[in-house]
């Protein structure tokens, strides 16, 4: 049992090292994109599928309620919560069509597999001239292909299973810390 515990935490540490090394530039770009939108008075919309829906909600909470410092909240809305009563591939798109504006940012967290509702919401964001940050996973080639030149993709496809969610969690925390630092300064 001790060996299994050690292997579990060793894989978590290795994942953290890969995330910090391989994704630093993309994480910085994502944080800059979200920060610029917030400073311009725009909103951040988040959504995800499967277990990634929880990570999208967490990012909205970090923006709206604060991450590591006490501060005023930022305008962040989780589309999953707003689309709870809807079903089908257009459920996220319908909410985005109603509430989002050009220059807002959509952050999408995918658990993998080219989720049709996520493809649809990305297409809607493109039609509305929004910026997109995509935290993708394995088999998300259609999601990635939908992105524009100025959008940001952080692909966690090299990780498997729970390590994908762990990597995405760390990325969300890092983006949140960078946003707070860029807007409020500090260490």
Kindly give the residue locations of the regions a language model identified.
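Catalytic cores of large soluble enzymes that bind and process phosphate-bearing ligands
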Residues: 4, 22, 26, 163, ...
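A ubiquitous structural signal for well-ordered alpha-helices
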Residues: 8, 15, 30-33, 59, ...
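A short, well-structured juxtamembrane/interface segment
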Residues: 19-40
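Generic N-terminal amphipathic, Lys/Arg-enriched alpha-helix
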Residues: 1-21
């Amino acid at each position: 049992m001790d060996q299994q515990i050690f292997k579990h935490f060793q894989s978590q540490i290795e994942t953290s090292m890969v995330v910090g090394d391989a994704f630093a530039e993309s994480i910085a770009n994502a944080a800059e994109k979200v920060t610029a939108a917030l400073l311009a008075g725009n909103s951040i919309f988040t959504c995800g599928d499967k277990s990634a829906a929880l990570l999208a909600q967490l990012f909205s909470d970090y923006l709206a309620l604060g991450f590591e410092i006490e501060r005023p909240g930022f305008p962040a809305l989780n589309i999953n919560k707003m689309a709870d009563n809807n079903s089908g591939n257009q459920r996220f798109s319908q909410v985005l069509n109603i509430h989002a504006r050009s220059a807002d940012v959509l952050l999408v967290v995918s658990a993998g597999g080219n989720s049709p509702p996520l493809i649809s919401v990305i297409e809607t964001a493109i039609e509305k001239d929004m910026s997109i940050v995509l935290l993708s996973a394995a088999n998300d080639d259609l999601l990635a292909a939908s992105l524009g030149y100025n959008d940001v993709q952080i692909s966690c496809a090299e990780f498997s299973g729970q390590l994908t969610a762990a990597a995405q969690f760390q990325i969300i925390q890092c983006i949140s810390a960078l946003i707070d630092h860029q807007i409020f300064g500090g260490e």
